[in-house]
Amino acid sequence: MNVLVVGGGGREHALCWALRRDAASAFSEDLTLFAAPGNPGTAALATNLPIPATAVDHLVAAALRHEIDVTIIGPEAPLAAGLADRLRKAGRTAFGPSAAAARLESSKAYSKEVMRRAGVPTAASATFVEETPMLDYIATHAEPVVVKASGLAAGKGAVVCKTRAEAAAVARAMLAGSLGEAGKEIVIEEFLEGEELSVLALTDGERLVILPPAQDHKRLGEGDTGPNTGGMGAYCPVGIATTSLLARVRAEVFEPVLREVAAQGSPYEGVLYAGLMILPDGTPSVLEFNARFGDPETQVLLPALLPGFSEHLVAIAQRRWNPLATQQMLSVERAAVTTVLAARGYPDNPEKGAAIRLPDPAELGDDVIVFHAGTYRDNEGKLRASGGRVLSVTGLGQTVALAAHASRAAAERIAFEGKTWRRDVAWREIQRAGAA
């Protein structure tokens, strides 16, 4: 079987890692793995193809040339650009939603409208494309104010503003082009307090299976301070994700949204990620939808699961999925914590080119996996940072606390100039365990 993973980040390295791990037991034939564009981490597991993840025409041509059986699309941009549609039209099989269904992520305004029509709990909001009515709305809004670019902004398009004045300035800048096309439409939203939870579901458009939830750490600094990022760490399992809560998430979030997009003629196929705020009264409220696996959530979810999970992604793509079989293998084998190591200046102006000293895997131990994201090799073969989020360091353990210790100990041993990271990933779960 020939499989292509599209993307070059930590999520895609984790997907390649899982596919390679599962190859012997889950697939009935030999696995030939490709990544486009991949990174130095995927190069050890797959053949990297030097094709950008957004080069749809070239990716389709590569899928035909290499006789790819299944393409697993990692990032949001190629989904929004219609890569899954184009592959299917060319007679290839793809894991990922159509461009129309992927609007749940690529347009926050559309996502809000879908939730309104489906009766899904979410923060009150209003959408604007013109400055004057937007500023008038902000002027009477309760503080804090959440300002979101409607389009794709690499996880950095949502800003929690303490004051109306700050919100007005941020919204005006977005509308003026600070985030490019992503900010041409602005969503102004009420601020919700509670605890965030990342819940992902596999679906073929009709049936769904909820995966073990994770908790992301969006803020750059320890203690959840600083600007929003694409994610500075994550952990799994999460204590607040009880069976009863997940039953509510299924009934109140996933099922009505899937029905609504199907009714609009855009059935959703692939993985749907619900970024939730669990309110103090236990109500799950949707902050956002993503049309793909989360990053860095994937880097904890896949190592935590029993081997064999990736075959179920292939089964969905090939329209032969058995949800019951997926549900039966979803027990979390071990806790997992990933710590993201970012470049200095991230997220606004990350530095590039720092040389990375990465110990051999044997030195880090069997309970640590390092996933590459923003890395490359120079002309001499030296590993360097290409900016942004550079590495995800995943630790495994019988408890979240032990997994966090393994992750942090390994992160300490990885060196590059300007290394920026949080030493408190999973602090809520560790605090909960200590209070129990």
Report residues per predicted region.
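A conserved helix-loop-beta module that forms one wall/lid of the active-site cleft
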Residues: F95-G157
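Generic C-terminus detector
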Residues: T375-E380, R384-A436
